[in-house]
Amino acid sequence: MQRLCAHVLILVLALAAFCEASWKPHSHLQDAPVAPGANRGQEPLRMNRLGPASNPRRQLGLQDPPHMVADLSKKQGPWVEEEEAAYGWMDFGRRSAEEGDQHP
């Protein structure tokens, strides 16, 4: 039982270290110097609307969900062509059956 607890503890610590390491590249956004008055009035408005941001959300910079969804909708991969090819094959079978019904 102690061995299992030790393995679970090591796993949790490793995952915590991995998560912390994955957030570190974004932390430079928070530490970057900003010109005085550049974002005056924007930050309090966002904070009031969204509530207090968690540490990871602050490090990422407060992004609105519509912007993230728009970015995802622009991405297309090679699977689109594969799906079109698969649907074309299925349509071929259906069209053949429909043509057989029309001609006596």
Curated annotation (Swiss-Prot):
The modification Phenylalanine amide is found at F92. The keyword Cell membrane does not apply. Residues 22-58, 96-104 form a propeptide. Residues 1-21 form the signal peptide. InterPro entries: GAST (IPR039236), Gastrin/CCK (IPR001651), Gastrin/cholecystokinin_CS (IPR013152). Its main location: secreted. The keyword Transport does not apply. The modification Pyrrolidone carboxylic acid is found at Q59, Q76. Residues 27-77 are annotated as: Disordered. One of its GO terms (cellular component) is extracellular space. One of its GO terms (biological process) is G protein-coupled receptor signaling pathway. It is found in: Secreted. The modification Phosphoserine is found at S96. The modification Sulfotyrosine is found at Y87. Keywords: Amidation, Cleavage on pair of basic residues, Hormone, Phosphoprotein, Pyrrolidone carboxylic acid, Secreted, Signal, Sulfation. One of its GO terms (molecular function) is hormone activity. Gastrin stimulates the stomach mucosa to produce and secrete hydrochloric acid and the pancreas to secrete its digestive enzymes. It also stimulates smooth muscle contraction and increases blood circulation and water secretion in the stomach and intestine. Belongs to the gastrin/cholecystokinin family. This is Gastrin. The gene is GAST.
